[in-house]
Amino acid sequence: MATKEKKELNPRCQWTKFAVATILYLLFLVWVESWWGLIVVPFIFDVYITKKIKWQWWRESPNDATRFIMSWVDALVFALVAVYFINLFFFQNYVIPSSSLEKSLLTGDYLFVSKVSYGPRKPQTPLTMPLTQHTLPVFDCDSYIEWPQWKYERAKGFGHVELNDIVVFNYPAGDTICTAPQYQAQDFYRLAYGLGEGAYAQTHGGYLPNLSKMTLQQQRDFLAQMYADGRRIIDSNPSEYGHIKARPADRRENYVKRCVGLPGQTLQIKNRIIYLDGKANKEPDNVQYSYYVKLRSQMPLELMDELGISMEDITSLNTSGYLPLTNASVKALKAHKDVVESVTLVNDPTTWDIYPLNGNKGWTRDNYGPVWIPKKGATLKLTMSNIAIYERPIRVYEGNDLQVKDGKIYINGKEAKYYTFKMDYYWMQGDNRHNSLDSRYWGFVPEDHIVGKPIFIWWSHDPDHSGFSGIRWSRLFRFVDNIK
């Protein structure tokens, strides 16, 4: 013990520790380009050299209980600060909560997500409890304090988001939520529009007007009224919906999807196939679509396991129903003629809940666009036919006031015929194409929402099986880049 204390007090040893710690810290400051951090250097000097501040005062306390309790507090605080720092700048854990990326990434996959692949964001909401996204467990309250809010900046990374990368990002439409637990995960805007349109239909014989017969200004005014009415319904029913609350960009729910469109590209979906600048983009190997399956008898559990059909997928299936299937699964299912009567691809003509919600484009999830994806520094001509698509990036993500009056567009009080974007945007979709809430429903993902890149699956457990039988051994430490 005496030898250890002597070593700790050895001036040469202390100066060496100080030099190493300071060099590493200065390199970190160079990387994140944050010179405010230099104010910490005198404190590092004090820890190793001058020791004027009693950083561990409790060690000298005569009270055993004080020393015991404070030693645990010290260890806990150090651990939380270390975890906060590592998660913020280097990597974090992410678990796949739904089947939107199946069969590429499965429900129950735990991902190692790298922040340095695309460069970590500097703190935007710095006063946040480590190991939480937005809510404190048990207490069910915010795990962050909204003040201060720092502007978006990103340190340099090893690369940029590339086409077909699987990406973790903050859910863009999560900027506004209902605080009632059963509604927090829902798209607030789809909920508000749906409630407003439902209320309108109730007072008009169950029908909505034919938007295609309206002018673009009339369409816009009608849909704006539907949203306002829906929001009013939510606001006036706190017992059902809770309160309407805004969340900062970095405190919104984390999503994981595949990037299928890059800044500056023109995307169009034709008969389920994604085209970029007129060329078909390769589908993921395990892309899934919904099929209507008619059975002759109940599907055996062995066949479900063989085809990778989860209980989440089959909840609506009795003797007939809908299943998300890969091409290989469709062929295998059709081969079991003793169980399966027919398998038919589902064509959903629904247009009302497709982005943009404030404009009538007549697009569906399988036939969408064309739509140009905004690029930083690129200038777009604004028209009444495209303003519904780009209003959200201009107004919400880039912080401008946008108004449309008498067919004219005003940005920050001035008539605008062009707009130059301040950020890059991306188009994200799930590989489970008919069971994924993605850019087709809520639009572009701005660059300041990008969290990181999944590197590998460090753990995987099938939620349909318990104990060791649910461990997917073949997926452990599988690299995500190898999942195409």
List where the protein language model places each region:
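Extended hydrophobic leader/signal-anchor segments used for secretion and membrane insertion
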Residues: 2-484
